[in-house]
């Protein structure tokens, strides 16, 4: 029997990625000009599947965590289990990654954009929500992320899916800008 080249594979996230955390920056550390930084709050206030423009800056501290490129970010804390289950891909390197961020570095077989879409929707979003712990503030740990079950097609298919969502995101952004500019 020949293997279907379009079949999706199943794996645990911990089998295809390594995990780390951002390091301690807060809104008080932001400056008008400096090194670009992503704080965990951005994943709530300016959520994007792919973060490709950064509008917050800081002065770099010792032992800062700097993006290598192609990571996926998930908040480590939030107000609700549903809210915390969201992910964003960061393709650029050289960006400071602030505290309260779970950082996923893909080792093989996965597109960061596809992974961010997958973790933010459907069964994986539900699985992340169930793993979040806490009452008034919920937390999601990297050890929780390692056991998330993923289904994924081949890398070329993931890239096609990611490209489609990127076009949709850009179209939505364009329409939002036009809507904001238009008079009532």
PLM regions: where:
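Extracellular/lumenal glycan-associated surfaces
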Residues: 159-171, 175
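Short, ligand-facing micro-motifs at secondary-structure edges
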Residues: 44-57, 72-97, 113-117, 126-130
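Sequence-specific dsDNA recognition surfaces
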Residues: 14-26, 41-69
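Structural detector for helix-capping/boundary residues
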Residues: 11-14, 41, 122, 143
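Short, recurring structural edge motifs at helix starts
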Residues: 1-3, 25, 59, 135-137, ...
């Amino acid at each position: 029997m020949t293997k279907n080249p379009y079949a999706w594979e199943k794996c645990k996230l911990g089998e295809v990625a390594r995990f780390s955390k951002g390091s301690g920056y807060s809104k008080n550390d932001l400056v008008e000009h400096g090194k670009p930084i992503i704080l965990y709050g951005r994943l709530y206030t300016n959520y994007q599947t792919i973060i490709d423009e950064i509008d917050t800056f800081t002065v770099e501290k010792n032992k800062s965590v700097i993006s290598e490129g192609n990571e996926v970010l998930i908040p480590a804390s939030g107000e609700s289990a549903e809210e915390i289950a969201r992910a964003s891909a960061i393709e650029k390197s050289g960006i400071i990654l602030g505290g309260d961020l779970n950082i996923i570095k893909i080792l093989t077989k996965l597109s960061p954009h596809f992974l961010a879409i997958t973790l933010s929707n459907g069964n994986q979003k539900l699985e992340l929500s169930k793993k979040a712990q806490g009452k008034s503030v919920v937390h999601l740990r990297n050890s929780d992320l390692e056991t998330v079950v993923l289904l994924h097609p081949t890398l070329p298919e993931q890239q096609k899916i990611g490209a489609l969502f990127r076009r949709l995101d850009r179209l939505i952004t364009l329409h939002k800008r036009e809507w904001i500019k238009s008079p009532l």
